[in-house]
Structure formats: C-alpha cells, structure tokens
Amino acid sequence: MSSSTWTPDALLSEARPSLGEDWRPVGARHRVSTLPIVDSLAEQEPLEDILEKTKPSVPLECRRLDYLLSTPFRYGAAYPAGSRFRRAGKILGVFYAAETPDTAVAEMVFNRFLFCAESPDTPWPDGTTEYKDADAWADLIDHSACQHLADRAREAAIEIIRYQSIRDPGGEASLAALTCRAFAEAGPV
C-alpha cells in the first residue's frame, strides 16, 4: 500500500495487539545530572523536587505510570525537528521501545551517535526492502512518511506502531507508543 492509502480504517484493519515485553534502555540522568552539584543524596532530593515543579504536568491519563513511561507524554511544548512518528511543533509525545534488548541497544547507540556526531556529510548505507513505503519509512533524515502514518494511526485510535528498526543490523522490530494508554503496567518491569 502506498502512504496515500493508509487511511485510519485501513490502518485499523491491520492493527494487532502487542505481544509481550518491550525494551528501552534508560539512563540515570536524574541521579547523575544533579548529584555533582550537591554534597549528598539528602541535598539532592530537594533539588530534584524543585526541578520536578518546573516541568510540565503529566497528562491525567498518564499519571498511573512510572515517570520512565510517562515522560515522553508530558512535554507538549513545540518540538523542534520531529522524530520518526512525531511531527515538529506542538503534538502529543511518543514513547519509543523495541521488541528485543539488542534492538533497543541499537536504537540507543544510534541516537547517542547522532547526539555526538558533527559530520553531516558521512555517507549512510543503503538497504532494500520488499514493501513499497518501507524506503520512505526508513529514511534517516526525512520522517514525514512516518509522521503521516502516525497521524492516520491516531485517527484510527491505534496506540502502538510496530516497525522495523533501521538501526539494528538484524532488522528487528521497534515500537512507537502513540499514547500512554498503551502501557499494560504502570511501571517498568
């Protein structure tokens, strides 16, 4: 199907339940970012409380979730560049995860690489795929096809998009939770 035929009804006809555990590596930024500027854990706690009060509130439907799961949904401010399933501008957040630990690590490594890289002329490997829209969905820079798909999925009330990781050499699946209602558990397991 071409991207123009991915209507909410067409997407809904392809929707399937999530099949189990999903993976997302997390850092301990809440510990390492503020701990160096205080002398003890006792001093860090009030500092973290102050920082928490400056952040946007967690949406009502996400308040049952641990902060590691709800954080992507609390920031509704203008998002500068967009991501695979989130347009630039003011739009609902997306929680990205993977079906296997290896894929989760591959996604994390790639994102860390992007954060550190300052070589826009670096050539990227080419890949082929059997699906007509997969090339557009796998573009490393232009996420408009995925954002269009996410828009249609939201219209169809689809909560999770399962997609092939372009960063995992094995091509395993990754997941994009479009709403915090997609979580079966309130905290990470």
Where do the language-model regions lie?
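Active-site and NAD+-binding cores of ADP-ribose-processing enzymes
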Residues: 1-89, 117-189
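Short, well-ordered beta-strand elements within core beta-sheets of diverse protein domains
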Residues: 92-98
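Internal, conserved structured core segments that host functional sites
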Residues: 99-105
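Short active-site loop/helix that positions an aromatic residue
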Residues: 105-116
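Generic preference for flexible, low-structure residues
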Residues: 89, 101, 111-112, 177
